[in-house]
């Protein structure tokens, strides 16, 4: 044991000596940040529809892009623990808006086309549904979620990440999703179905950002 202590002391002195020979001007202070996990409080939380929205973005392979929003019309989450989260969000596709096209006529034409059966066929499928099956805190206020996305009557599993921030016993969520529209029969100029359209092909991946505010259900 005495020999082990001596060896450790010698090694420590060598390390200190080695560090002291470095240029003091080049030394940098290393700070270790303690990231606090977000602990979710059990309960049922309802979406505040007027303060929540879903942002969308899609791209043409030629470089053009469009972005806009759709409105959350209802939704809630039920929290049992930080790893046991389930819920459902319903989106009104008739509320679809486009932000990037400033010309009123062009904007109206695009939205009309997106609502047609070439794309989301909102006459027959007015809503899209996102279900949360489970959620896991992975770092700080960042969570990984497993869920299901339903568009045009077709449901597929989806994995996505997002941040959840507590705000006076309520929560703000910022969720990032990417879905392949071709899986949901949204096939117009699909990159996976057509190869002869050149830069007129529209990318299959559609990006969604769900910005939602939740308030605890006072009746529970």
Identify what each model region corresponds to:
Residues 1-17:
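Sec-dependent bacterial lipoprotein signal peptides
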Residues 19-220:
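Low-complexity, acidic/polar, glycine-enriched regions of mature
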């Amino acid at each position: 044991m005495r020999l082990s202590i001596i060896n450790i002391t010698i090694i420590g002195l060598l390390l200190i000596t080695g560090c002291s020979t470095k240029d003091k001007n080049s030394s940098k202070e290393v700070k270790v940040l303690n990231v606090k996990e977000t602990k979710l409080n059990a309960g049922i939380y309802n979406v505040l529809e007027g303060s929540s929205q879903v942002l969308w973005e899609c791209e043409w392979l030629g470089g053009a892009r469009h972005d806009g929003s759709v409105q959350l019309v209802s939704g809630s989450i039920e929290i049992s623990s930080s790893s046991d989260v389930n819920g459902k969000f319903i989106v009104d596709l008739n509320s679809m808006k486009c932000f990037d096209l400033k010309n009123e006529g062009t904007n109206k034409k695009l939205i009309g086309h997106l609502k047609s059966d070439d794309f989301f066929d909102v006459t027959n499928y007015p809503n899209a549904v996102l279900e949360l099956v489970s959620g896991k805190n992975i770092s700080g206020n960042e969570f990984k979620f497993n869920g299901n996305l339903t568009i045009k009557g077709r449901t597929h599993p989806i994995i996505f990440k997002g941040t959840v921030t507590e705000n006076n016993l309520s929560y703000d969520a910022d969720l990032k999703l990417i879905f392949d529209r071709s899986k949901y029969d949204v096939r117009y100029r699909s990159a996976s179905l057509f190869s002869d359209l050149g830069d007129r092909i529209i990318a299959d991946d559609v990006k969604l950002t769900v910005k939602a505010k939740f308030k605890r259900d006072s009746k529970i």
